[in-house]
């Protein structure tokens, strides 16, 4: 009996060793894959453009959006249109001074757009909906209120989706949203959003968390083992307040948030790639006469760099716009210079997240920096 028992025991031992070897091999394989993955954490205040950057990675480095995904987005896009009209028209009575409809006969269309029928989740947005939207949106009073959108909360893509050409496309029964439609579609981000992609055999994992104050408590869960942080700020928000209250300037909120991230004890060795985003909207606002000094008094005494290469600046850039974009850049860089210990660095870039070519160029220029950070992280450099 003992002989047979010993043979069985030997077989069990051999099998256990074999299993242990397989486990060790898998662990080494997993560790190698884990260390090869470049983790990019997207942070920033609400509505800065973080989820748009993730969409761009899907367009640039994956297969883009399938027809099925595009059709699914159509509901969100039409919901955006409804929300735009409701937001602007509800704000009319709350502005100081308030604004009235230019044509009282549009009141009937307005009541329809405010009705419970239109706000149902299963609403099918018939021709009647788009006719009412057109009548109300082109009302002179509504247009006046729309021009004062910095006084309330209106999504950046309002002008894009409310353009008559886009409205005509969207009401077509077989319309399939294009990349710009999807990039500009606004859905409030809650929880973690992510994408994985490969560029020149290098594996990236880009992920982020909603930027509203209530979402930020989840950020700490994401800090572990990140290669770099991409901090996104909406430079165009200099004359706006945050959704959570009616007095905190959005850009100052971003500055405070950036300072907290830069000085966070868990992130003192993690460098930050700073996306100074929404440069297109910033330019539109400056060209329309919006004054930065009304919100940031220090803008009056600011002097932009003397060595600007104008050939690398956006075509048609006014001196005021160039001054504004570098003013905001330098406000963030002052934070990094104030408490710089040489353990992490900040790399600023001007971005327009809805511009695929711009994001392609910026990300390409960041890749070498990201890979260097990754090698330093694992002491391979």
From Swiss-Prot:
Residues reported to bind Mg(2+): 51, 189
Region (G4 motif): 273-280
Tagged with keyword Plastid: no
Superkingdom of origin: Eukaryota
Region of interest: G3 motif: 204-213
Stretches the record annotates as G5 motif: 351-356
Protein name: Guanine nucleotide-binding protein G(s) subunit alpha
């Amino acid at each position: 009996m003992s002989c047979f028992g010993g043979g069985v025991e030997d077989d069990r031992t051999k099998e256990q060793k074999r299993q242990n070897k397989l486990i060790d091999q898998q662990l080494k394989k997993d560790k190698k894959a884990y260390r090869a993955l470049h983790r990019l954490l997207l942070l920033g205040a609400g509505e800065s453009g973080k989820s748009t950057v993730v969409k761009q990675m899907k367009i640039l480095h994956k297969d883009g959006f399938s027809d099925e995904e595009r059709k699914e987005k159509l509901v969100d896009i039409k919901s955006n249109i409804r929300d735009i009209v409701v937001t602007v028209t509800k704000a009319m009575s709350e502005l100081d001074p308030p604004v009235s409809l230019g044509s009282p006969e549009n009141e009937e269309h307005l009541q329809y757009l405010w009705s419970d029928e239109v706000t149902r989740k299963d609403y099918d947005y018939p021709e009647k909906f788009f006719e009412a939207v057109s009548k109300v949106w082109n009302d002179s009073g509504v247009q006046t209120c729309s021009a004062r959108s910095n006084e309330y909360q209106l999504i950046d893509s309002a002008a894009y989706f409310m353009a008559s050409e886009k409205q005509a496309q969207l009401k077509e029964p077989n319309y399939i949203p294009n990349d710009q439609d999807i990039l500009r579609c606004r859905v409030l981000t809650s929880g973690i959003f992510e994408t994985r992609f490969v560029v020149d055999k290098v594996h990236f994992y880009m992920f982020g968390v909603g930027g509203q104050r209530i979402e930020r408590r989840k950020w700490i869960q994401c800090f572990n083992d990140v290669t770099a942080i991409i901090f996104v700020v909406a430079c165009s928000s200099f004359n706006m307040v945050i959704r959570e209250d009616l007095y905190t300037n959005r850009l100052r909120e971003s500055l405070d948030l950036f300072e907290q991230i830069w000085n966070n004890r868990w992130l003192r060795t993690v460098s930050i790639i700073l996306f100074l985003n929404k440069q297109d909207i910033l330019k539109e606002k400056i060209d329309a006469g919006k004054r930065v000094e009304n919100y940031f008094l220090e803008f009056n005494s600011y002097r932009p760099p003397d060595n600007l290469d104008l050939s690398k600046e956006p075509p048609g850039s006014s001196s005021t716009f160039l001054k504004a974009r570098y003013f905001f850049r330098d406000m963030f860089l002052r934070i990094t210079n104030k408490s710089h210990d040489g353990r992490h660095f900040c790399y600023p870039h001007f971005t327009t997240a809805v511009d695929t070519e711009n994001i392609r160029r910026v990300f390409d220029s960041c890749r070498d920096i990201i890979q260097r950070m990754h090698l330093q992280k694992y002491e391979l450099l």
